[in-house]
């Protein structure tokens, strides 16, 4: 099988002889070729097993180290051009790794999934597993062995998540327990160049400052080469670094431009674009499905980060974040406004409740307060007579309240007497003296009063009567001849005075006694009888069999039982 020729710069190659080959033919000697693809420190030593010497030209590029074991490198000592190295199909790729202060070599073809217990690490002339290597390095307390092992100062997990390194033939052999990144970006899914193409240029990210190592690969035939390409050695897209450095169209190298121009010239651009679109869609669809089935993982974050940086979509992501932030701020402002309005309404409700309670208390106090009826205006009394003394012969009568229907002539009488503890005085007015009953003052009701009349009367007459301050009404009586008034030695039957409510009409019934006993009975009944049928408050008129009846109607008002506008009428048989 024809050999594939790999051309690399001399400064990027380190030749290291293997063990046990010192006395053999140089043509049969195996060597270690170090391709510097990742940033490492100058003068890297690997436990003395490999003699590692980086040329000055390589140290200037700050590139990474990849160990390649080949068969024979012909006549290097004889001055053959070291810029061209022939490698056959038995090439083995190795990575120098570290764990703490310990250093070892990771044999990539033995590094199969899941890798933790696979003997793929060469440490102190022994082939051990990564787990054993971490234990010997004193980092067994770390649960994640991929974080404990570093490749060029970078954690192995980070290298695997970014797609720069993966398990050997991971797409074919996977234990489903690796939990490593299994996505195919353009840089990891690149295939060998099209058959017939002599030279292709690929670029890989090499350092944080954006320096790029170019590997020129020339081959006679892909079918004869049989070389397996790995994502760590070939790439089709220039990836932006983690610092977000963008590659403008002006910064693209001429070789890269020629590469894509060649694809377009052979008519494969449409197919390449379709494949790229399909791969990206499948990649993003897988991320969405994993988000639904399980919590967000680190591998998904690495995929999205690489896609966003590769295609310059970070601005789009920032726009989405800005829109969501604006929506959240608007919602927060609306929430605060609503909360403030609700607090204001609550304060108003509290004030209304307090006002309502105060009004209710005031109304209740008013209802429970005793109602005092205003006193009606006092009416002027009919007359303010003197006390129980004998009035003068000519008392002044300014406002007569009673009208004399039938005047009579009465002989003057000048004597006074009392009966039943009721003071009685004789009123002399010209030739017509009248007996006046003066009752004691006070709010109590006076039940009885007495009048005097002649023993024998032939013609009844009516006289004017002036009631006292405490007597509501005094009725006149039928008198006989004035000559007989001197014989007033007997008292007639008493007069009953009954009170009733203020403002009601009073009826006064005066009845003259028969001529046989010569007595006159005057009854005053101003209050209605409780057992009477008349509901308007009129007094019941008492009927007696008398010769002469007198009917006196008067109107009583107020609690003092005063009577005004009294009409005295004499009725004869």
UniProtKB/Swiss-Prot annotation:
One annotated Gene Ontology cellular component of this protein: cytoplasm
Keyword Ligase: no
Residues reported to bind Zn(2+): 113, 170, 174, 178
Positions bearing N-acetylalanine: 2
An individual GO BP term: regulation of transcription by RNA polymerase II
UniProt key word Glycoprotein: no
Coiled coil location: 321-367
Binding site for DNA: 139, 143, 146, 157
Residue ranges of every copy of the SAND domain listed in the record: 82-166
Compartmental location: Nucleus; Cytoplasm
Keywords per UniProt: Acetylation, Coiled coil, Cytoplasm, DNA-binding, Metal-binding, Nucleus, Transcription, Transcription regulation, Zinc
GO molecular function, one term: sequence-specific double-stranded DNA binding
Record region (Disordered): 370-398
Origin superkingdom: Eukaryota
Function recorded in the entry: Trans-acting factor that binds to glucocorticoid modulatory elements (GME) present in the TAT (tyrosine aminotransferase) promoter and increases sensitivity to low concentrations of glucocorticoids. Also binds to the transferrin receptor promoter. Essential auxiliary factor for the replication of parvoviruses.
Subunit field text: Homodimer, and heterodimer of GMEB1 and GMEB2. GMEB1 and GMEB2 form the parvovirus initiator complex (PIF). Interacts with the glucocorticoid receptor (NR3C1) and NCOA2/TIF2. May interact with HSP27 and CREB-binding protein (CBP).
Protein name: Glucocorticoid modulatory element-binding protein 1
Native source organism of the sequence: Homo sapiens
Name of encoding gene: GMEB1
């Amino acid at each position: 099988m024809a050999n594939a020729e790999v051309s690399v710069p001399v400064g990027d190659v380190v030749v290291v002889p293997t063990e046990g080959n010192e006395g053999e033919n140089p043509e049969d000697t195996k060597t270690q070729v170090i391709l510097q693809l990742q940033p490492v420190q100058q003068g890297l030593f690997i436990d003395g097993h490999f003699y590692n010497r980086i040329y000055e030209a390589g140290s200037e590029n700050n590139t990474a180290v990849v160990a390649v074991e080949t068969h024979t490198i012909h006549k290097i000592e004889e001055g053959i051009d070291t810029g061209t190295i022939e490698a056959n199909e038995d090439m083995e790729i190795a990575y120098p790794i570290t764990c703490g202060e310990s250093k070892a070599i990771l044999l990539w073809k033995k590094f199969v999934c899941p890798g933790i217990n696979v003997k793929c690490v060469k440490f102190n002339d022994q082939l051990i597993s990564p787990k054993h290597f971490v234990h010997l390095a004193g980092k067994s307390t770390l649960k994640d062995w991929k974080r404990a092992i570093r490749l060029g100062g970078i954690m192995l997990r980070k290298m695997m998540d970014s797609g720069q390194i993966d398990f050997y033939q991971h797409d074919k052999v996977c234990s489903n327990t690796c939990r490593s990144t299994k996505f195919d970006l353009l840089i990891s899914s690149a295939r060998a160049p099209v058959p017939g193409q002599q030279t292709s240029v690929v670029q890989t990210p090499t350092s944080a400052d954006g320096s790029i190592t170019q590997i020129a690969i020339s081959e006679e035939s892909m079918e004869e080469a049989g070389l397996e390409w790995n994502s760590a050695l070939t790439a089709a897209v220039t990836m932006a670094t983690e610092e977000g450095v963008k590659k403008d169209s002006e910064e693209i190298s001429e070789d890269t431009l020629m590469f894509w121009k060649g694809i377009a010239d052979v008519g494969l651009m449409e197919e390449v674009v379709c494949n790229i679109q399909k791969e990206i869609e499948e990649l993003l669809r897988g991320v969405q499905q994993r988000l639904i089935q399980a919590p967000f993982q680190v591998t998904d974050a690495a995929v999205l980060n690489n896609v966003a940086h590769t295609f310059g979509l970070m601005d789009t992501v920032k726009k989405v974040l800005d829109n969501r932030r604006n929506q959240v701020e608007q919602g927060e402002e609306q929430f605060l406004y609503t909360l403030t309005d609700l607090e204001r309404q609550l304060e108003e409700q509290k004030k209304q409740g307090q006002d309502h309670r105060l009004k209710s208390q005031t109304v209740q106090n008013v209802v429970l307060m005793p109602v005092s009826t205003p006193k009606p205006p006092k009416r002027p009394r009919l007359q303010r007579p003197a006390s129980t003394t004998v009035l003068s012969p000519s008392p002044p009568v300014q406002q007569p309240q009673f009208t004399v229907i039938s005047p009579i002539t009465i002989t003057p009488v000048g004597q006074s007497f009392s009966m039943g503890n009721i003071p009685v005085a004789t009123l002399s007015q010209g030739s017509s003296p009248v007996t006046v009953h003066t009752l004691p003052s006070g709010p109590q009701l006076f039940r009885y009063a007495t009048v005097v009349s002649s023993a024998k009367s032939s013609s009844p007459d009516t006289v004017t009567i002036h009631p006292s301050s405490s007597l509501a009404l005094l009725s006149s009586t039928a008198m006989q001849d004035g000559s007989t008034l001197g014989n007033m030695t007997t008292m007639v039957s008493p007069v009953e005075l009954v009170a009733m409510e203020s403002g009601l009409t009073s009826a006064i019934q005066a009845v003259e006694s028969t001529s046989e006993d010569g007595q006159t009975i005057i009854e005053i009944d101003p209050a209605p009888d409780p057992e009477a049928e008349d509901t308007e408050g009129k007094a019941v008129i008492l009927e007696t069999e008398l010769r002469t009846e007198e009917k006196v109607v008067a109107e009583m008002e107020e609690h003092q039982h005063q009577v005004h506008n009294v009409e005295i009428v004499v009725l004869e048989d």
